[in-house]
UniProtKB/Swiss-Prot annotation:
It comes from Macrococcus caseolyticus (strain JCSC5402). It is found in: Cytoplasm. Residues 163-248 form the PPIase FKBP-type domain. The gene is tig. This is Trigger factor. Keywords: Cell cycle, Cell division, Chaperone, Cytoplasm, Isomerase, Rotamase. Its main location: cytoplasm. Signal peptide: none annotated.
Length: 427
């Protein structure tokens, strides 16, 4: 097989591939074995029609597409490897020559991974963060923990306040006409959660159980339901029940409930302060790395193909869908509550997707410039670390990761970041 790679403008190029005639004939043989099983011809059992008779009746051309399906994937993969390129999108393939007994010639228009022009990445300056844990830090963290242990208690008297959970019925109207999705009974809504249309929750503050109130809001201009976008709506709301959050006091029993490894408030605070110190130190290290990465990326130049941005966008959408699923939502409900469309959500993510791609390309280029290689020892050490972290066997982790190259790429990036840290300067 012969391969010719012609680089074109930007990140485009064309592969011209010539496949030997014997491989073409082997592909035609496979195609015939597949196709003949589907042919019914009087006088022959299904799948038993002789090849010469098949070609005489249907023409050898009837086998070409199936033969290409057998030949092209392996031929294209081998051509990519021989040319030493890294495609980032599906190729546009054109068949130049396909004939029994002759070479197959095809071209593949390919978008390849761009080359990065690195700027300064050594000697970058970074501020050293204060990692001391103050009493104020500790108290805020404890208050947050206690708030998570809060119980909802029915509020018999008093007005609805921020943070209360209100059970309500509502009927929505636009131009005095009910609309789809605008009615609910016994709905629990936390005031201040931002679940509803802007302005809805705020108007419930100050109401009481049994109150009935008209709440007037305006749907966002970019609301997913076009028939409601930008329109004013009136919701007739009835307050059925109000619950407030009752935060427990911190005593020895509560300390043990918050952390089973301690038996008193003092022990809880001591351990918690140590944990916070470790977290703050780790956060400072991460912030330093993020600052150095951001500077290195800012200093680099690269022309990113749209295909790479779109691939990253798809990955980010999957991550987002998984996150909201943990909150009991799906994308359809999210669009309804947020007033966004899928296109608007993707557009809001596009800058981050491009930044992610540029970051990965820049770090990979630094790893290449520094001749960073990952040994089997590096991989084994990381697998052991992951095994301990996740409580899984090394074999299970290998199975979950699939291609070992993915882990090697991750380790290569980590070592590139280590270079940034090692070569940095404190402001």
């Amino acid at each position: 097989m012969s391969v010719k790679w012609e680089k074109q403008e930007g990140n485009e190029g064309v592969l011209t591939v010539t496949v030997p005639a014997e491989e073409v004939n082997a592909g035609l043989d496979k195609a015939f074995k597949k196709v003949v099983k589907q042919v019914n011809v009087p006088g022959f059992r299904k799948g038993k029609m002789p090849r010469p008779m098949f070609e005489q009746r249907f023409g050898v051309e009837a086998l070409y597409q199936d033969a290409l399906d057998f030949i092209l994937p392996d031929a294209y993969a081998a051509a990519v490897e021989e040319a030493g390129i890294n495609p980032v999108d599906r190729p546009e393939i054109d068949i130049e020559q396909m004939e029994k007994g002759k070479e197959l010639i095809f071209t593949a228009k390919v978008t390849v991974e761009p080359e990065v022009e690195l700027g300064d990445y050594k000697g970058l300056e970074v501020e050293k963060e204060d990692t001391e844990v103050t009493e104020e830090d500790l108290n805020k963290a404890i208050e947050a923990d206690l708030a998570r242990k809060a119980e909802l208690v029915v509020k018999e008297e008093g007005e609805v306040a921020e943070g209360d959970v209100v059970n309500l019925d509502f009927d929505g109207y636009v131009n005095e006409e009910a609309f789809e999705g605008g009615k609910a009974e016994g709905y629990d809504l936390e005031i201040g959660s931002g679940q509803f249309i802007p302005g809805f929750e705020e108007q419930l503050v100050g109401t009481k159980v049994g109150d009935e109130k008209d709440v007037t809001v305006t749907f966002p201009e970019e609301y997913h339901a076009e028939e409601l976008a930008g329109k004013e709506a009136v919701f007739k709301v009835k307050i059925n029940e109000v619950k407030s959050k009752e935060v427990p006091e911190l005593d020895d029993e509560m300390a043990k409930e918050l952390d089973e490894s301690v038996d008193s408030v003092d022990a809880y605070k001591e351990k918690y302060k140590k944990d916070l110190q470790e977290q703050k130190t780790l956060q400072a290290e991460n912030n330093m790395k993020e600052s150095l990465i951001a500077q290195a990326v800012e200093n680099a130049k690269v022309d990113i193909p749209e295909a790479m941005i779109n691939t990253e966008l798809d990955r980010m959408m999957q991550e987002f869908e998984q996150r909201i699923a943990q909150q009991g939502l799906n994308l359809e409900l999210y669009y309804q509550f947020s007033g966004q469309t899928e296109e608007q959500l993707k557009e809001s993510m596009k800058a981050d997707a491009e930044a992610r791609v540029k970051t990965n390309l820049t770090l990979a280029a630094i790893a290449k410039a520094e001749n960073i290689e990952i040994s089997d020892t590096d991989v084994d050490a990381e697998l052991s670390k992951m095994s301990e972290q996740f409580g899984l066997s090394v074999d299970d982790i290998k199975a979950a990761l699939g291609n070992g190259e993915v882990l090697k790429d991750d380790l290569r990036i980590q070592k590139a970041i280590d270079v940034l840290v090692k070569e940095s300067k404190e402001k």
